[in-house]
Swiss-Prot record:
This is Thioesterase poxG. Its EC number is 2.3.1.-. It comes from Penicillium oxalicum (strain 114-2 / CGMCC 5302) (Penicillium decumbens). Pathway: Secondary metabolite biosynthesis. Belongs to the lcsJ thioesterase family.
Length: 303
C-alpha cells in the first residue's frame, strides 16, 4: 500500500507540473525523445565505440584461429531509431542522417575487426616475413561512401544496421551496410531452412531492406598505401593456406582460401559500379559549358 500511495502521489505531482509548465514539459519530452541528436552526442557515441573495442575488449581479437576464414566477412550490427530531429518535411528519416548512423556502425566494425591495424601486439607472429617488411602502425581511412535508398523509415521507427566486408582490390577494401527491420537476420536464418528457391529468398531479403550502402577504406602505413590483402594477412584475417582449420568459436572451419577468393570476386562485381563513380570527379571540367543558375547561402540569398 505504501508503494501504491507513493506512485499515486508521484503521478499527481507530475500532472501538476505538466499543467503548470506545459511548454517546458513538451520541450523536455522532445529533447529526451531526440537525445540521439543532442550536441556532441555523435562524438560521444563514436568515442564510446572506440573505447569499448580498443580498451575494454582489447584482447577480443578476430582471427582465423578463433572464427575461421569466414570471420573476415562477419557482420557488425548496431540498432537505432529515427527521432523527430532526423525527419524531413516528408515525414520520414532524412536522407542525410543515414550517413551519421553509418559512421557509428562502421567505427564499431573497424575497431572490432581491424584491432591489429594500430597495435602490433595484437597481430599474429609471421616468422616467414622479415620484421622490416611488416607494416608498422596502420590507419584505416575512409575513401568514399554511397547510399541507395529503397524504402522510407518512419519517425521513431526502430531499425538495425548490418555491415560486413564485401570485397577488396589492389587499393581499396569495400564494406557493405544494410538498414533493415529489427530481427531480420534471425528471420532470414530461419527461412533459409524452409524456403529452397533462391529467387524467393532474394525477394524476401529485399523486402527487409530500407537502404543499402557501400563504403571504401584504404590502409595506410604512414604515407604508404598497404594492399588490403597484405593488411588482412598481417592482422591474421587472411591466410594463403588451403587447409581446413579447427577454430575455438566456430568448430571446424570449412572455408578455404579459394572460397574466400570466390566470395571476394562476387563482391567486387558489385563494387565495380561504385568504383566507376570516381569518374565523376573528371566531369567538373565541363562546368563552364553550362548556364549559371544562381548562388545561395545558408539562408537563401541572405547569407
Amino acid at each position: 500500500m505504501v508503494s501504491l500511495s507513493c506512485l499515486i502521489s508521484y503521478g499527481e505531482c507530475l500532472l501538476e507540473t505538466v499543467q503548470t509548465h506545459p511548454w517546458s514539459t513538451i520541450g523536455v519530452v522532445v529533447f529526451l525523445s531526440s537525445v540521439k541528436n543532442a550536441p556532441l552526442m555523435w562524438h560521444a557515441r563514436l568515442i564510446i565505440a572506440v573505447f569499448y573495442h580498443s580498451v575494454t575488449r582489447k584482447n577480443d581479437v578476430v582471427t582465423i584461429e578463433r572464427y575461421g576464414r569466414q570471420g573476415l566477412f562477419g557482420y557488425i550490427v548496431t540498432s537505432s531509431r529515427s527521432p523527430l530531429y532526423e525527419c524531413d518535411i516528408n515525414g520520414h528519416k532524412s536522407d542525410s542522417t543515414y550517413f551519421s548512423d553509418l559512421d557509428i556502425n562502421r567505427i564499431h566494425l573497424i575497431t572490432r575487426l581491424f584491432k591489429g591495424a594500430g597495435d602490433l601486439s595484437l597481430r599474429p607472429d609471421r616468422p616467414n616475413v622479415a620484421p622490416e617488411d611488416r607494416p608498422k602502425k596502420m590507419r584505416v581511412l575512409l575513401g568514399g561512401t554511397c547510399c541507395s535508398f529503397r524504402r522510407e523509415i518512419k519517425p521513431y521507427a526502430a531499425y538495425e544496421i548490418h555491415s560486413r566486408v564485401l570485397a577488396w582490390d589492389e587499393k581499396w577494401l569495400y564494406v557493405v551496410s544494410y538498414f533493415v527491420k529489427p530481427g531480420s537476420a534471425r528471420k532470414m536464418a530461419s527461412l533459409q531452412t524452409e524456403v529452397g528457391d533462391k529467387c524467393e529468398m532474394t525477394d524476401l531479403a529485399r523486402s527487409m531492406v530500407f537502404t543499402s550502402a557501400i563504403t571504401k577504406f584504404v590502409f595506410k602505413d604512414g604515407r604508404k598505401t598497404v594492399r588490403p590483402a597484405d593488411a588482412l594477412e598481417e592482422m591474421g584475417l587472411l591466410s594463403a593456406s588451403e587447409e581446413v582449420v579447427e577454430t575455438s568459436e566456430a568448430g571446424e572451419d570449412l572455408w578455404t582460401r579459394s572460397r574466400v577468393e570466390e566470395r571476394r570476386k562476387t563482391g567486387i562485381k558489385i563494387a565495380q559500379h561504385f568504383i566507376a563513380l570516381d569518374e565523376l570527379h573528371d566531369q567538373f571540367e565541363h562546368v563552364s559549358e553550362h548556364p549559371f543558375l544562381g548562388k545561395f547561402g545558408v539562408l537563401g540569398t541572405m547569407f
